[in-house]
Amino acid sequence: MISTMTTSKSKIGTMTKKPEHSGLLVIDKPQGVTSHDVVAAVRGALHMKRVGHAGTLDPMATGVLVVGFGNATRLLNYIVDHNKTYEATIRLGQRTTTDDAEGELLPGEWAESFPSRQAVEQLIAERFTGRIEQVPNVYSAIKVNGQRAYDLAREGKDVELKARPVTIEEFNVRQVRYGYTHSDRAGAELVGAVVAEKASDGWIANIAPHEDMQPVMELDVTVTCSAGTYIRALARDLGEELGLGGHLTMLRRTRVGRFSVNMPNVMSAHAESKTFTNREGMEVTRNRAVLDDADHALDHALDPVASAAASMSMLAVSEQEAADLRSDAESRMTYVRPRRRTLRKPTIWSLSSNVRNAVRPNRSRYSTEPSNQTTDTNSYTRRT
C-alpha cells in the first residue's frame, strides 16, 4: 500500500492527518471516453482531488494513459515529454473534417487507382520519417488566444494553426488491405477486404455498380514519435501526398516512455453510459470511465521511488559512491553573508514662490534656515 502518515503538534495536542497517497497508475484507456473522464474515475476511487494525467488521448483512442496522484503529479511534466508508440489504422480514399473516424466525410471523387505497399513504404521513408513539419487539425486541444482550437472550430470560427516540428522515429506498415466501404459515413466497416501487396486488376470496376460503396485502401501501421505528434495528421498528410485523402479509423497507444501497455500492473477500465438531467432540465446521455478494479486501485500503482525511476533518467551508484557524492556536495556549499546596504542621506527640496532651496539634513536635525545666497527663480541652493 502506498501511503504516508503525517502528524502535526498544536496547543491542543497531536493531530493526525489522513494518509497521503502518492504514485502513478498506468491505465488502459477504453474507447469512447476522454482522458479527463479517466482522471475523474481515479479521483473517485482514491477519494483524492490531486490527480492528473500525462498526454491526452482522443475519445476514439485507447491504450496507455499515465495518471499521477498526490506528490507524484510533479512527475507528469517529465512524462509528457517522453516519446510514444502507437498502433493505428489509416484509411486511404476518404477525408474527414477531424482527420479521424469521429468527423464527417468530406466530398471527394473515387480513387481511380491505389498504390502498392512498396510505393507507400517508399513515400513514408522519404517524406514521413525523421524530423518533419506537421500542422495539427483544427479539432485539437491546442490553445489559440486562450481558447481551445476545437471550441473555436465548433463555433464556426476560422482557426489557423502553425506548422510545428516533430520527429518520427519509426513508421512501419504491418499490413495492407483493399476493399470498399459506405460512402455516406466515416468509420464504416470495410467490406470485401483483401490482404495483398497491391490491388488486383479490375478491382475498382467490380464495385462500380454499388453506388453507396466506395473503394478504399487500409494500412495497419506502427509509429514511434516525439511528444506533440498527431497521428491523425500523419494519416491526412500521407493521403494527400498519395492524392487519395486519408483519415484515421483506429488508434491505440502502446507505450509512453518506459510505461507500456504490457506492464503487469496496468489497470483496465471500460466505458459506461450514464443518463442525467442537465441544468436546463434536459436528459443527457454520455459515457463515463469506470475502473475495473477500483477498490484495489492502489495495488496497481507504482510507488514514488519506482515512479521517479520510470519517469526520469537514472544513474545507479553504490553506497560508497552515494556517500562520496553527498560529501562532495556538502563541501561545495558555502555560506555567504548578505551585504549590508548603506543608505544615503536624502536630499529634501523645499519650494517657495520665488526660490527653490535644497537642504541635506545632518544626523542631529534638519536645517530649515534660509540660505544667505540670493538667487533668481531658476537657481537653487543646496546646503550640506
Name each model feature, range by range.
Residues 2-30, 36-53, 57, 123, ...:
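Accessory RNA 3′-end/elbow-binding domains used by RNA modification enzymes
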Residues 6, 16-38, 91-117, 159-164, ...:
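Active-site-proximal helix-loop elements at catalytic-domain edges
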Residues 22, 62, 83-86:
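Short glycine-/polar-rich loops that comprise or flank the Walker A/P-loop
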Residues 50-80, 138-139:
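Glycine/acidic-rich beta-strand-loop module
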Residues 67, 88, 146, 234, ...:
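Residue-level signal for inorganic ion chemistry
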Residues 72, 78-136:
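Acidic, low-complexity central loop/insert segments
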Residues 124-128, 132-145, 149-232, 237-244, ...:
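Non-catalytic interaction surface on structured domains
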